[in-house]
Amino acid sequence: SPEGLPLKCLMNSAGELMWDVWAGGQISGEAKENATGSLNAIFGGECDANGPKKYTTGVGDENNWDYIVPLGEMNFGHVTPVDHFYMYYPKDADQRAPGSFSITSPADGAIIDVQDFRKMNNWPYPDFRIVITHSCDLYTVLIHIGALVGAAARAEAEMPADGHWVGNIPVKAGEIIGDRSQAEKFDFSTFATDAKVDLINPLSYLAGESWKPYTANPLDYFPADVTKAYEAKMIRTTKPVGGTIFYDIDGTAQGVWFVKDTNGYAGLQGQRSVRSETGFNSRGYWDTHLAIAPHHVDTAMFVYSMGDFGGQPVQFVTKGNIDPSTVKAGGAPVVVDLLPFKYTTPDGQAMDIFSPVKDYKLAPQTDIAGSLAFQVNADGSMTVEKRPGKDAASFTGFSADALTYVR
């Protein structure tokens, strides 16, 4: 990168290849400090210290979206809470003419990084990731953009064979830069200096998704009228309506964990995403991830999200809805029964998750899929044993299958 940080083609949170800072390379102490110290060091390129610190318009017309999913979803290979909104199109969007669903820059700035997943992942259809710097303190990331439009098209014209373009294309607030993805949705993230959270162990993100501490709620950065319009499309009404990804509580089981000595968020990059017989993505960098946190819509329910439970990433709730913040260092091992769940409307009617309603609820099922034993240790680590097919009552103590997780 321009800041002297080595890059490597890594797998991102969607199981796609992309370029990111690589901790496996020779990183100096200064570069390591930079990687956790500023957005410009993370995203690279030039930035304007005096540029916008807030958005001045939206990323598109809210009337074009069916609904918006807030920050914090944990879903299959997205084991830890995701750092982006999902902007869902109507189900007939693939039948609309090109140009029907435009994506715009939310403030003045410059496109500094574009990745072409068609080249990087050998996909048969166009799919782009765009990074926009609005200032040294405000960045926008858009993923699964189906076509680059206007000035942004220059990046595609100049795209290297490796699928990663770096440069500087000035854009204005409201300028159309993309068209509807051929997928059902696109991802939208905001990263801001004033949103930075002091993580328990920020170095766990140095090797992958090093922007995580700067994850902002995009609704906090729009003009009031845009925020109001976007909130109306949100499937969550609990405040903050835009959700959050930050659930770590030191000294408890709640939050995000990684198997010790597996390179933090980046995980074991030798594992490529494959499809299991059940159709789920299995065996990826997320194998070593664990998150125990509130659901992103039904926030009263705690989700136990694991990257490798019997060979695939899964999310469960627990019998009794055990609150992980009550499991603290110094206590005895806790063992919970893991339950699959379905979805209902707020009044208890069955609901299709692909046609969600506001404030839907999780409905735990009765069949026990297995159990999870865990104990928070005095040094801040956690001993964890995943027990597919075994209920909590059968636990007699940790076995050789137990692993140590760290923040």
Locate predicted features.
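Short peripheral tails and domain-boundary helices/loops at the edges of structured domains
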Residues: 141-144, 192-232
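Surface-exposed, glycine-biased beta-strand/turn segments
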Residues: 27-128, 136, 172-173, 215-345
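A short acidic/small-residue loop/turn micro-motif
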Residues: 119-120, 147-148, 184-185
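Short hydrophobic beta/alpha edge segments that flank linear recognition/processing sites
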Residues: 127-132, 168-192
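Beta-sheet ligand-binding and adhesion/scaffold domains
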Residues: 321-407
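Short histidine-centered loop motifs in beta-beta connectors
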Residues: 96-99, 104, 133-176
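Short, solvent-exposed coil/turn segments at beta-strand boundaries
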Residues: 3-4, 14, 283-286, 291-300, ...
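Tryptophan-rich substrate-binding surfaces of secreted polymer-degrading and adhesive proteins
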Residues: 1-28
